[in-house]
Swiss-Prot record:
Red blood cells. SUPFAM superfamilies: Globin-like. GO terms for molecular function: haptoglobin binding; heme binding; metal ion binding; organic acid binding; oxygen binding; oxygen carrier activity; peroxidase activity. Keywords: Heme, Iron, Metal-binding, Oxygen transport, Transport. Involved in oxygen transport from the lung to the various peripheral tissues. CDD domains: Hb-beta-like. Residues 2-146 form the Globin domain. PROSITE patterns: GLOBIN. Belongs to the globin family. This is Hemoglobin subunit beta-1. Gene3D superfamilies: Globins. Heterotetramer of two alpha chains and two beta chains. Transmembrane segments: none annotated.
Length: 146
């Protein structure tokens, strides 16, 4: 299912409250700790051998912020998310060889981080809207693999 007008409205009305630095660090840290095989893409980040090391790693924090900032920019291009992510998709597929399933996994981790931030405001309806967005982004980033 694609993004509906209502999804877009919900996302646009809440994304401004997201702190890319905080949410990015938490979501990427959660991905790296929950799915340890994803750490192979981040060997330059140094020690990722414990939860404490992952969640206090400055490179994890910086990259998480970069990813969430990119999602904020993608929200401005919801009519053409595939176009927005075309070059990044190519880079992830041809240069980094990232397993495209990891994009979906990151979306799940990001959903958890958003739920922790928004609490009661993160209704099932808002959760669904963000899942639709993260699915569209995962699809766009995975496009280079097809």
């Amino acid at each position: 299912m694609g993004l509906t007008a209502h999804d877009r409205q919900l996302i646009n009305s809440t994304w401004g409250k997201v702190c890319a630095k905080t949410i990015g660090k938490e979501a990427l840290g959660r991905l790296l700790w929950t799915y340890p095989w994803t750490q192979r893409y981040f060997s330059s980040f140094g020690n990722l051998n414990s939860a404490d090391a992952v969640f206090h790693n400055e490179a994890v924090a910086a990259h998480g912020e970069k990813v969430v900032t990119s999602i904020g920019e993608a929200i401005k291009h919801m009519d053409d998310i595939k176009g927005y992510y075309a070059q990044l998709s190519k880079y992830h597929s041809e240069t980094l060889h990232v397993d495209p399933c990891n994009f979906k996994r990151f979306g799940g981790c990001l959903s958890i981080s958003l739920a922790r931030q928004f609490h009661e405001e993160y209704t099932p309806e808002l959760h669904a809207a963000y899942e639709h967005l993260f699915d569209a982004i995962a699809d766009a980033l995975g496009k280079g693999y097809h």
